[in-house]
Amino acid sequence: MERYESLFAQLKERKEGAFVPFVTLGDPGIEQSLKIIDTLIEAGADALELGIPFSDPLADGPTIQNATLRAFAAGVTPAQCFEMLALIRQKHPTIPIGLLMYANLVFNKGIDEFYAQCEKVGVDSVLVADVPVEESAPFRQAALRHNVAPIFICPPNADDDLLRQIASYGRGYTYLLSRAGVTGAENRAALPLNHLVAKLKEYNAAPPLQGFGISAPDQVKAAIDAGAAGAISGSAIVKIIEQHINEPEKMLVALKVFVQPMKAATRS
């Protein structure tokens, strides 16, 4: 959890926002997936948001569903994902690592056991996409027991009660939704969310990172101009993996070319 705090403090000092890429662990295979993650970090990623392949990803659009299918096709299991996480942490001791996943994967292990394993491999945060705030108690309690930040999604239509709950229960960062619906680069992020950002700040919420539909540097800049601490980009990155699926070296170059200007857009 502390890794987020020190990241946001450093960025504030440098007058920068955070650029956070999302990829699915094991897509398109374990070895290439680890290379992808190294490339994202080398190109300027400030933190990582990683998915564990799951058979029924509700909030994901077609791009990320395909990533999951590719990981399954490569035979990637949750146990292997945790081995990958341990390797990533070993190689990159300071970068915040977040998991974005679904409740079934947590239940399969047992809630406490799942968060214990997260702590062991050096995961900093977990966002359980299909668990609303009001049902989150067993998850967030286990998370805090194991020094893992529980992350909550703040939707664009959040009312005051929900904003207070998110501020009170969330740690690490707040996942600020650009819009309702499923993830996807083709659904561009809509209006800047100034009012939500102001409210979250008023209630002392963890710093908001804007996600969903972030696929261009101008959107990263707009998110930060609206008061967000940074932006998360998933589908646009996963699409690059898909486009270069048979050219592993070209894929890494294309990812670098995408991430560098996205990170540059966080600098005021």
Curated annotation (Swiss-Prot):
Record SUPFAM superfamilies: Ribulose-phoshate binding barrel
Documented EC number(s): 4.2.1.20
UniProt GO molecular function: tryptophan synthase activity
Pathway(s) of this molecule: Amino-acid biosynthesis; L-tryptophan biosynthesis; L-tryptophan from chorismate: step 5/5
Annotated catalytic residues: E49 (proton acceptor), D60 (proton acceptor)
Keywords recorded for this protein, A-Z: Amino-acid biosynthesis, Aromatic amino acid biosynthesis, Lyase, Tryptophan biosynthesis
Gene3D superfamilies: Aldolase class I
Catalyses which reaction(s): (1S,2R)-1-C-(indol-3-yl)glycerol 3-phosphate + L-serine = D-glyceraldehyde 3-phosphate + L-tryptophan + H2O
CC annotations in GO: cytosol
Signal sequence residues: none
Pfam families in alphabetical order: Trp_syntA
HAMAP family per the UniProt record, alphabetical: Trp_synth_alpha
General function of this protein: The alpha subunit is responsible for the aldol cleavage of indoleglycerol phosphate to indole and glyceraldehyde 3-phosphate.
NCBIfam families in the record: trpA
Subunit structure and binding partners: Tetramer of two alpha and two beta chains.
PANTHER family, A to Z: TRYPTOPHAN SYNTHASE ALPHA CHAIN, CHLOROPLASTIC, TRYPTOPHAN SYNTHASE, ALPHA CHAIN
Family according to the record: Belongs to the TrpA family.
Record-given protein name: Tryptophan synthase alpha chain
Gene name of the record: trpA
